């Protein structure tokens, strides 16, 4: 896994390219990723960097975590995440330092992970795009029901994984191969072409794309 950043989804807007095209972009604030720990093969069995993002009141931090952050000399954040890196990259970082937008460049392909918007309890039409039943012609009470969910005596049960009504959204999802359209280094913003998971102010993880294709 490559070194990435934790950020906050600010919202969406549109920008104009040099060719005059208007493209939709998502604004992601990725400033002040503070390094809380650097893990190595010798001490932890693997190499990684641990970072925190955002701000949290001291009264809302547990004593073990407060001690961990105090040892690193950083302020408490809303979220802590790890990025697996190689030993050479880990040697360039130091506890108490910070990471910012200079990890990325305009035109680079990235993967963005976030928690999707929760929709609550949803029916099969909204959840799985089932077709509605007939409005008339003998259909009186089965307009938006899923229909048959299995056979009768044999096998006499509903198979696991059957698509039915249930909770929709509020799950972790990753959108791959998004393009960085613009970088505002002064305000520590990434403008990502297209949409990313989550609601406004939701936390996201931005990493270099794992499936990026080399330019011809």
Curated annotation (Swiss-Prot):
The ranges of region (Disordered) come to 134-153
Q: Does the keyword RNA-binding apply?
A: yes
Q: Which GO terms describe its cellular component?
A: cytosolic large ribosomal subunit
Q: Which GO terms describe its molecular function?
A: rRNA binding; structural constituent of ribosome
What are the alphabetically sorted keywords of the record?
Methylation, Ribonucleoprotein, Ribosomal protein, RNA-binding, rRNA-binding
Positions of post-translational N5-methylglutamine modification: 153
Q: How is it modified after translation?
A: Methylated by PrmB.
Query: Which InterPro entries does the UniProt record give?
Result: Ribosomal_uL3, Ribosomal_uL3_bac/org-type, Ribosomal_uL3_CS, Transl_B-barrel_sf
Known PROSITE patterns for this protein? RIBOSOMAL_L3
Keyword Oxidoreductase included in the entry's annotation: no
Any single biological process term in GO: translation
> Can you tell me which family this protein belongs to?
Belongs to the universal ribosomal protein uL3 family.
Protein task: One of the primary rRNA binding proteins, it binds directly near the 3'-end of the 23S rRNA, where it nucleates assembly of the 50S subunit.
Quaternary structure and interacting proteins, as annotated: Part of the 50S ribosomal subunit. Forms a cluster with proteins L14 and L19.
Name of the protein described by the UniProt record: Large ribosomal subunit protein uL3
Q: Which gene encodes it?
A: rplC
């Amino acid at each position: 896994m490559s070194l990435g950043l934790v950020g906050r989804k600010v919202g969406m807007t549109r920008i104009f390219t040099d060719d005059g095209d208007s493209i939709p972009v998502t604004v992601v604030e990725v400033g002040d990723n503070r390094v809380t720990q650097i893990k190595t093969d010798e001490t932890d069995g693997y190499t990684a960097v641990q970072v925190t993002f955002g701000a949290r009141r001291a009264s809302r931090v547990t004593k073990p975590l407060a001690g961990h952050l105090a040892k690193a000399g950083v302020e408490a954040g809303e979220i802590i995440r790890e990025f697996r890196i190689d030993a050479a990259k880990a040697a360039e970082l130091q506890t108490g330092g910070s990471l910012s937008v200079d990890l990325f460049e305009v035109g680079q392909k990235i993967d963005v992970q976030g928690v999707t918007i929760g929709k609550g309890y949803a029916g099969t039409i909204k959840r799985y795009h089932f077709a509605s039943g007939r409005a008339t012609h003998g259909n009186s009470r089965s307009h938006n029901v899923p229909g048959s969910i299995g056979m009768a005596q044999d096998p006499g049960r509903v198979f696991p994984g059957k698509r039915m009504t249930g909770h929709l959204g509020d799950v972790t999802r990753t959108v791959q191969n998004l393009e960085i359209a613009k970088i505002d280094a002064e305000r520590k913003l990434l403008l990502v072409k297209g949409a990313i998971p989550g609601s406004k102010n939701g936390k996201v993880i931005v990493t270099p794309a794992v499936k990026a294709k080399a330019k011809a």
